[in-house]
Amino acid sequence: MTDDAVHTAPGRARQSDIYRAGASGSRPRIPTSWPDLVAAAERAMSPEAWAYIAGSAGRESTAEANYDAFDAWRLVPRMLRDVSSRDLSIELFGRRHPFPIIVSPVGVLELVDPDADLAIARAAGSLGVTSVISSQASFPMERIAAEDAGPRWFQLYWSSDDELVESFVSRAEASGAEAIVVTLDTGMLGWRPRDLDRGFLPFIQGMGIAQYTSDPVFRRLVSERMARPATGAKPRVTSAAVRTLVSMTKRHPGTFRENLRSGEPRAAVETFLDVFSRPSLSWSDLPFLRERTRLPILLKGIQHPDDARQALDAGIDGIVVSTHAGRQVDGAIGALDALPGVVEAVGGRVPVILDSGVRGGADVVRALALGATAVGVGRSWVYGLAIDGEQGAREVLQNLIAETDLVLGLSGVATVAELGPEAVTRI
């Protein structure tokens, strides 16, 4: 695709690329249908990685509710409208974004590919798509930012240590983040049977904690821990325990030999598990963050209209309606079902982003029609990464943009700004 085609007619340009390659006998390595994409990704991942990435909480009914919510709404296409030129761009926090799509934060991407955080940064940046760097990345935010030519935000898990929170925000600002996305729904880890039945939590292996081990405040906390007398029983020596020790040791900054001698990697993992989340986080904590950054602050995980109103009262700049892809609370409402109530409560005063359950362009268009300013996507591009690395992630995003463009035009709508609730009906 040429740069002009990507932004003015991405659907037709993407189709042309695929069909022309097909005429020479080449087929897309990245499946364009959701079921085939999921199946190909599962084949490409280890059982542990697949369980962690694809799994959700409990019976996974919230994950299903996310999908069911989209299926309950149907587009109502209009005919004989000039849609020869389409505009997918949106305005967010003073920046014009070419597409209404945000790359949502996904942690522990090294389960899929060792360089996955860097790969998705490059893929998103090459398309001008805003990406959100995860607190649970496997590279420091500064390294990820250096790979990303596009706009980026930083996702904050609010630690039990305020000084660490402040350090993360300061680093995010310095590395060029344009917004802070506070994830609210992880005060405790959800009940995830796929991981529990395997006894597998990647953080214990030292995975996904590079933001922490690269942080001066966190490293001080680790040093303070190591200076205290050891407490508790020593881990039982088994082959699995040795593999865990090797895993955390090779991922920790420094040489393997020195890390093994010092015991710092284990102390870092234990410190992370202690400070990662704050179950006591409440509305009264938000001024602390507001006082420490001039960046827009978005709250991710809002589902109830009253929480949306309270967010406005707190001076929050944006809301992300999200169920964490169903990974935290089983039996909860689907994200799209929550969207209209939140949009109504907000009344256009701040942008509302829909995250969770998005499989393709038709889902993007339905969310936009129901009032979302933009749509966050996560698992789909992770699946692309698993299949074909950076190129796989890029192609998933290209396909999503292309389908969004085509569904928009075929529904008789020329611009995202024209989309409204009249474009859909509930069945």
Model-flagged regions — what are they?
Residues V108, R122, E147, S160-L354, ...:
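Alpha/beta enzyme core
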Residues R74, S89-E91, P100-S104, T130-V132, ...:
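Short, conserved beta-strand segments within well-ordered enzyme catalytic domains
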Residues N66, D197, A335-V342, L385-D405:
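C-terminal helical cap(s) of enzyme catalytic domains, especially alpha/beta-barrels
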